Amino acid sequence: MIRAIVTDIEGTTTDIRFVHNVLFPYARERLERFIRSGEQREPVNLLLNELRGEIHAPAASVDQLIETLFKFMDEDRKSPALKSIQGYIWREGYVNGDFTGHLYPDVVPALRRWSDQDIDIYIYSSGSVPAQKLLFSHSDEGDVTELLSGFFDTHVGAKRQVSSYRNISMKTGVPVHQMLFLSDIREELDAAREAGWKTVQLIRGEPDTQSTHRQVSSFDDIHPEQIPT
């Protein structure tokens, strides 16, 4: 039986338009002010040093780092330093009520159903763990973090790497064959399946004709008790 479900956020629990049309512009507009106002103190100075390490430029100036961050945003680069900085900026937006975290209406009822079945539910996203927690604690449905057993970001590895899913399995203590991964991205699901996980692909739009994973349009159609392990 499935003992743990790990779900992606963007395009899976949450409309991709919320991320690209609300969260990303909000962070972009405030990024330079956030950096310059805090560059001499934590956490900003630590994040800037992390970014210097990422780009192998230990002497990079703040101006160069800001330029790099904007470039990474343009490229949708999965930079841990960028994701952490965005998370700090989004915190202000969530706390001030500038927006709430979007969740598809089928998500929370399914999370409650799975939780009632004693299935542990985890989040795995390229967004930082603090940013993930903000979305689920300030969601359209209120604070639903009580339904979640934990959060993972790219510190366990990239989402298209097989080793990332093995790392998550080890951290949760759940054997790979009893793990179920939900995502809208075929390549992520391919990596999870190669690691030994079960997979379901969320299709919120047109079907993925190149995918070999089971495809559903709603969390309502996912019944982990029926998935053989």
Curated annotation (Swiss-Prot):
Keyword Hydrolase carried by entry = yes
Record InterPro entries: Enolase-ppase_E1 (IPR023943), HAD-like_sf (IPR036412), HAD_sf (IPR023214)
- Return the SUPFAM superfamilies for the record: HAD-like
List, in alphabetical order, the GO biological process terms annotated in this UniProt record: L-methionine salvage from methylthioadenosine
The note describing how and how many cofactors are bound reads: Binds 1 Mg(2+) ion per subunit.
State its cofactor. Answer: Mg(2+)
Q: In which pathway does it act?
A: Amino-acid biosynthesis; L-methionine biosynthesis via salvage pathway; L-methionine from S-methyl-5-thio-alpha-D-ribose 1-phosphate: step 3/6; Amino-acid biosynthesis; L-methionine biosynthesis via salvage pathway; L-methionine from S-methyl-5-thio-alpha-D-ribose 1-phosphate: step 4/6
Q: Where is composition skewed (Polar residues) in this entry? A: 208-218
Q: Where is the signal peptide?
A: none
UniProt keyword terms in alphabetical order: Amino-acid biosynthesis, Hydrolase, Magnesium, Metal-binding, Methionine biosynthesis
Q: According to the UniProt record, where is the region Disordered? A: 208-229
Sequence ranges of Basic and acidic residues compositional bias: 220-229
Per the record, what are the reactions this protein catalyses? 5-methylsulfanyl-2,3-dioxopentyl phosphate + H2O = 1,2-dihydroxy-5-(methylsulfanyl)pent-1-en-3-one + phosphate
- Group of enzyme by EC: hydrolase
GO molecular function: any one? Answer: magnesium ion binding
Q: What's the Enzyme Commission number for this chain?
A: 3.1.3.77
Stored HAMAP family: Salvage_MtnC
What does this protein do, in the record's words? Bifunctional enzyme that catalyzes the enolization of 2,3-diketo-5-methylthiopentyl-1-phosphate (DK-MTP-1-P) into the intermediate 2-hydroxy-3-keto-5-methylthiopentenyl-1-phosphate (HK-MTPenyl-1-P), which is then dephosphorylated to form the acireductone 1,2-dihydroxy-3-keto-5-methylthiopentene (DHK-MTPene).
User: Which PANTHER family does the annotation name?
Assistant: ENOLASE-PHOSPHATASE E1
Identify its protein family. Belongs to the HAD-like hydrolase superfamily. MasA/MtnC family.
Quaternary organization = Monomer.
Q: What is this protein called?
A: Enolase-phosphatase E1
